[in-house]
Amino acid sequence: MRVHIVNAHLTYPNWSEGTLNHAMAEKAKAHLGARGHDVTETVVEESFDPEVEVRRHLDADLVVLQTSINWFGAPWIYKRYIDEVFNAGLKSKKLLDNDGRTRSDPTRQYGTGGHMQGKGFFIAATWNAPADAFDNPDNTLFEGRSVDDLLLNISSNYKFVGYTVLRSYGIYDIFGTTDVA
């Protein structure tokens, strides 16, 4: 299996250095590599070439987003990454041709024009929120929503181009817990 890891952590000096996200990406690379999988990684903060990233998405069977969650979403550099990579994939018609709808077939639904069927997308995220804040109807902030509900703005991009979105993985309460292992 070919796996592409997109490490979207953004460093905030003296507050959020990315140690945990980088360690998680390294652990994933080592674990998958030891089992014979071909693994590539892009550290978005360091730089990326949209055309290279389109090729990596085409080549990968699974794309893993490793990210911190800041203010209930991925860091802004990830939005830039998606804009540049997916627009390059649309322009070249490699990731998708269109949004799926056609005038000749009104039954075609919005979000069905992608070419990435048979591929998976997985989010591994670090959260300051405690795990019991999710799927909890008594939680005032999230009101019973799951982690995946809150990550819909991220996963929908991949579903739009045809990926199967897998259930996410999270490490929670990272500032409130001294041991996140």
Residue spans for each PLM region:
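Active-site loop/turn elements of alpha/beta-hydrolase fold enzymes
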Residues: 8, 44-46, 69
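Structural motif
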Residues: 47-55, 177-181
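N-terminal beta1-alpha1 ligand-phosphate binding loop
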Residues: 1-35
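A short, flexible beta-alpha/helix-coil linker loop
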Residues: 9-13, 128-137, 173-176
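A short beta-strand-loop structural module common to alpha/beta enzyme folds
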Residues: 35-48, 169-172
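A structural motif corresponding to the C-terminal end of an alpha-helix
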Residues: 31-37, 113, 119, 157-166
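Glycine-rich phosphate/pyrophosphate-binding loop and the adjoining helix
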Residues: 1-4, 20-21, 26, 140-181
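Helix-loop-strand module that forms the ligand-binding subsite of alpha/beta enzymes
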Residues: 51-154
